[in-house]
């Protein structure tokens, strides 16, 4: 499942969302996947449990979080949601706070998680200007067009 296709098919993009805490921000992304029947509601708690156990493991770059749990924690099919925040939030990460872009990932197996999910997200942000381009997006179509341009350039 490609990042772009998943976002388009599942209508799982939310731009300029408002959240007071990192937990609320993560819930917005998970709720989009629940609505699209990609994950069960318990996936959210699994992500919170992971943070309690390992710290903010999914804050992977300055401003960027990739919340995800394990396949057996309620994943029905592979999918992604993308959320940008109106106001960046602290996720208690030493190097990469504050966060205002969240790409929530659900993968049916570890292989898909690593090869498909992470590589597509790395590809999107290989050009660091794409962080600001994404922050500037105000419509779902603008996000999809940005991903299309990135894929065409790769």
UniProtKB/Swiss-Prot annotation:
This protein's record includes keyword Phosphoprotein: yes
PTS EIIA type-2 domain ranges (all copies): 6-150
Positions where Phosphohistidine occurs in the chain: 68
Active-site residues, Swiss-Prot/TrEMBL: 68
Subcellular location as annotated: Cytoplasm
PROSITE patterns: PTS_EIIA_TYPE_2, PTS_EIIA_TYPE_2_HIS
Pfam families tied to this protein: PTS_EIIA_2 (PF00359)
Phenotype upon loss of function: Cells lacking this gene are unable to use L-ascorbate.
GO biological process, one term: phosphoenolpyruvate-dependent sugar phosphotransferase system
NCBIfam families assigned to the protein according to its UniProt record, in alphabetical order: PRK10372.1
General function of this protein: The phosphoenolpyruvate-dependent sugar phosphotransferase system (sugar PTS), a major carbohydrate active transport system, catalyzes the phosphorylation of incoming sugar substrates concomitantly with their translocation across the cell membrane. The enzyme II UlaABC PTS system is involved in ascorbate transport.
Cross-referenced PANTHER family: ASCORBATE-SPECIFIC PTS SYSTEM EIIA COMPONENT (PTHR36203:SF1)
Name this polypeptide is given: Ascorbate-specific PTS system EIIA component
């Amino acid at each position: 499942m490609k990042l772009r296709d998943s976002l388009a098919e599942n209508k799982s993009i939310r731009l300029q969302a408002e959240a007071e805490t990192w937990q609320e921000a993560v819930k917005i992304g998970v709720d989009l996947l629940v609505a699209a029947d990609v994950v069960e509601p318990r996936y959210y708690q699994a992500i919170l449990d992971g943070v309690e156990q390992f710290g903010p493991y999914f804050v992977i770059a300055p401003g960027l979080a990739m919340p995800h749990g394990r396949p057996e924690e309620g994943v029905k099919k592979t999918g992604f949601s993308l959320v940008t925040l109106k106001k960046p939030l602290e996720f208690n990460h030493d190097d990469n706070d504050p966060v205002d872009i969240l790409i929530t990932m659900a993968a049916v197996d570890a292989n898909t998680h690593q090869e498909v999910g992470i590589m597509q997200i790395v590809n999107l942000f290989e050009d660091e200007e794409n962080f600001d381009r994404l922050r500037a997006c105000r419509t779902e179509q603008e996000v999809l067009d940005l991903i299309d341009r990135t894929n065409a350039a790769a």
